[in-house]
Amino acid sequence: MRATAVLLTVTLALTAPLAEADQCRLKPKEVVTRFMTQFYLDKQVRAAFETWVEPGYIQHNPLAMTGRDAAIAFLEPFFQAHPDASYSIKRIIADGNLVAVHSHAKFTADDRGLAVVDILRVDHCKIAEHWDVAQPVPEKSANTNGMF
């Protein structure tokens, strides 16, 4: 019985790092896709950030503070105040450890919304840095191509 307990302890100790290594086999695009799904689509702000974002997360948006905890502190109340907010991910493009997400953000169902591009740098399966730009979807366009 004691030998079984020792063997089980050794096995668990050896496989725990392997489980983390398996997760880190994810490509940056896969990390961002999982993060964006959990954050934007499922609106699980805290879980998404605690799972996929580095504590020292660098934020380049001049209206937001840097750091994972600061992002959670800002975004949780935002989603509570805007329960009808929705995001439609249009495309995710990766180049090495940089991933761009083009999405349509709306605050209400009848809102034309914003065309948003988030650029994220992934390091060791965690989002380490973020840039974003947003442009209002106009009522009328000079062309018929659409923003998405």
Residue ranges and their predicted role:
Residues 5-15:
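Bacterial N-terminal signal peptides
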Residues 18-148:
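C-terminal and inter-domain tail/linker signature
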